[in-house]
């Protein structure tokens, strides 16, 4: 949510953000309701002032004047009461429209309609060169007996998954490694629930507009969040922190749930797009200093890149265009990791800076060095998400016999093992393990 004063003073800037982000919002309607609300409040305040002045006259009035003044006070009270429904309706309308106002993108953000217009910034790591026909992650899991897609589909339907044996240990190793890695970078580990109240999804910016992506608990006012960003963003809702308490930086682990509405037919097979997953999320609350916030943006981006380098996975960083960055984002970079079976990079991380857009929604403020109450700034980035990260991990580290080479960083979490699985296919005499170009 943007400052209403800023919207009034910079309607052209806000309209441009609405246009380039593809937001369905009539800013002129918002400004009209705002003007009408100002007028209504002025009328109510004028009536209240008149009523208060009238009330002061009653004790001093003569017996002849008093009945008239008392009646006038009642009439003024009725006039005020008659305006209250209009006042509340305008306040509600304005609030709902303000929640849809997008943030202003950073000047560096490219203008575009969708992810096809994102801009690649850099590539890291060398793509694997296999001396054998590589398998995709589904085949690798099935040949090792690490999955059971048919049975789990009968239990949970499409976009569900089940891991067995060493695949479970690998998933847990990745999550624990990510937590340890981020803790070493100064983030506080946090384990949080995925169950949240609807207002937390408003606070994070997922509502209004993303309702079809969220699972609801019938018979209860609770929903299942798709990221730990949602509950962590509301942990300090309505609070006033001190200058010294910020920044707060968390590595939050939780289950995550997404309905994947609008994804029919996309990534149905395998682990790329599932309804339930586990995720370690980086989340930062910092002071209202854009330079400081952008330093944090660089830090949590580097954290994610450091994790991928430690997992020995090739990746690229792209800057999201205006049409692919979400309403609340000032700046957003995606990290995409190489998936050999698809011959392309797939998104595994999203790094975002939101200014005070979320803090205004939750009421998170702090006292600056001058004692003034100001809204905090927030940032977030994926630490690691499973099982999606297992896709590039399995495929990039597969060996000719179908076993998986364990990256050195994960070996302490797997009892020192260097290889997972057993040989499940004959390797050609000349075949070698993946080697780097």
UniProtKB/Swiss-Prot annotation:
Catalytic activity: tRNA(Ser) + L-serine + ATP = L-seryl-tRNA(Ser) + AMP + diphosphate + H(+); tRNA(Sec) + L-serine + ATP = L-seryl-tRNA(Sec) + AMP + diphosphate + H(+)
EC number(s) on file: 6.1.1.11
A Pfam entry, by short name: tRNA-synt_2b
CDD domains: SerRS_core (cd00770)
Source organism, top-level taxon: Bacteria
Record: residues binding ATP: 258-260, 274, 347-350
Keywords recorded for this protein, A-Z: Aminoacyl-tRNA synthetase, ATP-binding, Cytoplasm, Ligase, Nucleotide-binding, Protein biosynthesis
Enzyme class label: ligase
GO MF annotation terms: ATP binding; serine-tRNA ligase activity
Localization annotation: Cytoplasm
One of the protein's GO biological processes: seryl-tRNA aminoacylation
GO CC field: cytoplasm
Keyword Aminoacyl-tRNA synthetase in annotation: yes
Metabolic or biological pathway: Aminoacyl-tRNA biosynthesis; selenocysteinyl-tRNA(Sec) biosynthesis; L-seryl-tRNA(Sec) from L-serine and tRNA(Sec): step 1/1
Residues that, per the record, bind L-serine: 227-229, 281, 382
Main localization category: cytoplasm
SUPFAM superfamilies noted in UniProt: Class II aaRS and biotin synthetases, tRNA-binding arm
Similarity section: Belongs to the class-II aminoacyl-tRNA synthetase family. Type-1 seryl-tRNA synthetase subfamily.
Self-association and partners: Homodimer. The tRNA molecule binds across the dimer.
Domain notes per entry: Consists of two distinct domains, a catalytic core and a N-terminal extension that is involved in tRNA binding.
Function of the molecule: Catalyzes the attachment of serine to tRNA(Ser). Is also able to aminoacylate tRNA(Sec) with serine, to form the misacylated tRNA L-seryl-tRNA(Sec), which will be further converted into selenocysteinyl-tRNA(Sec).
Protein name, UniProt field: Serine--tRNA ligase
Lineage start: Bacteria, Thermotogati, Deinococcota, Deinococci, Deinococcales
Gene encoding the protein: serS
């Amino acid at each position: 949510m943007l400052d209403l004063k800023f919207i009034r003073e910079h309607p052209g800037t806000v309209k441009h953000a609405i246009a380039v982000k593809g937001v369905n919002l009539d800013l002129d309607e918002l400004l009209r309701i705002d003007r009408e609300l100002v007028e209504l409040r002025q009328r109510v305040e004028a009536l209240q002032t008149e009523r208060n002045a009238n009330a002061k006259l009653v004790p001093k009035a003569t017996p002849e004047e008093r009945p008239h003044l008392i009646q006038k006070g009642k009439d003024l009270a009725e006039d005020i009461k008659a305006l209250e429904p209009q006042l509340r309706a305008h306040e509600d309308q304005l609030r709902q429209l303000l929640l849809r106002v997008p943030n202003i993108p950073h000047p560096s953000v490219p203008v575009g309609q969708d992810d096809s217009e994102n801009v690649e910034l850099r590539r890291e790591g060398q793509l694997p060169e296999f001396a054998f026909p590589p398998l995709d992650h589904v085949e690798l899991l099935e040949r090792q007996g690490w999955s059971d897609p048919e049975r789990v589909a009968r239990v949970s339907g499409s976009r569900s998954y089940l891991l067995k044996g060493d695949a479970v240990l690998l998933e847990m190793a990745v999550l624990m490694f990510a937590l340890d890695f981020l803790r070493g970078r100064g983030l506080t580990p946090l384990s949080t629930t995925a169950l949240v109240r609807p207002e937390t999804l408003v606070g994070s910016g997922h509502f209004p507009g993303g309702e079809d992506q969220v699972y609801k608990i019938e018979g209860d006012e609770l929903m299942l969040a798709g990221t730990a960003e949602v509950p962590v963003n509301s942990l300090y809702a309505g609070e006033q922190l001190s200058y010294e308490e910020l920044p707060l930086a968390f590595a939050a682990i939780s289950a995550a749930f997404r309905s994947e509405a609008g994804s029919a037919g996309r990534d149905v097979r395998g682990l790329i797009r599932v309804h339930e997953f586990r995720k370690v999320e980086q989340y930062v609350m910092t002071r209202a200093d854009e330079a400081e916030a952008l330093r944090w943006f660089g830090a949590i981006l580097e954290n994610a890149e450091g994790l991928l380098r430690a997992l020995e996975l090739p990746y690229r960083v792209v800057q999201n265009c205006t049409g692919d960055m979400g309403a609340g984002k000032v700046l957003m970079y995606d990290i995409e990791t190489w998936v050999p079976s698809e011959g392309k990079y797939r998104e595994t991380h999203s790094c975002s800076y939101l200014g005070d857009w979320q803090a205004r929604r939750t009421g998170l403020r702090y006292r600056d060095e001058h004692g003034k109450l100001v809204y905090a700034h927030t940032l977030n980035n994926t630490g690691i998400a499973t099982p999606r990260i297992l896709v590039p991990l399995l495929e990039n580290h597969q060996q000719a016999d179908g076993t998986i080479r364990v990256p050195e960083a994960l070996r302490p979490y797997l009892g020192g093992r260097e290889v997972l699985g057993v040989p499940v296919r004959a390797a050609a005499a000349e075949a070698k393990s993946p080697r780097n170009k």
